[in-house]
Amino acid sequence: MIKLFIDTNVVLDTILPGRPFADSSAAVLRMGGDSCRMYLSSMSVATLYYVAEKIVGKDDARAVVSEWFRKNYVLPVSDICVYDALRSDCPDFEDAMQIACADYGDCDCIITNNVKDFRSYAPLPVFSPEEFLAGCYAASARRIEYLSSLPDARSIDDVVD
């Protein structure tokens, strides 16, 4: 199972009107399930609540955060994350905290709309939502092509057996 660390801006794209990456961000957030788990930092949850409260009010903001908890996971910003962020060369402290949290949480990659800054400092792969979706599509296409090339294989069960 792949562990995706979702940067704050990806979630905000789905609740703020007129954001340029809203569609791809929403598509990534719908992917959670058996094949991948999505994680936010506790710092992102606070930001998400704050922004949602300004847009939809206190009760609905709580519903937005509750919806995230229903399907996904939250990583704490620990003292280790803060220490790592302080030692980082990353000039943006918030980005450094997110990177440290993703690394400490043993995530496989970071999904952000700020790939330029994150890629320079993150010790793990960084993708924009569009890049991640394109990679998933390409992997699915290769799998379908492979399965269809097998003689008389009608399903994955035929291959596994």
Language model region names:
Residues 74-116, 159-161:
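Active-site neighborhoods of divalent-metal-dependent phosphate/nucleic-acid chemistry enzymes
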Residues 75-77, 126-129:
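Short acidic-hydrophobic, aromatic-tinged amphipathic segments that line or gate anion-handling sites
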Residues 51, 56-78:
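Helix-adjacent hinge/juxtasegments
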Residues 1-40, 55-60, 120, 137-161:
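Short, well-structured N-terminal submotif of metal-dependent ribonuclease cores
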Residues 70, 106, 121-122:
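Short, structured coil segments at secondary-structure junctions
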Residues 116-124:
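Short loop/helix-cap segments at secondary-structure boundaries that form the rim of catalytic
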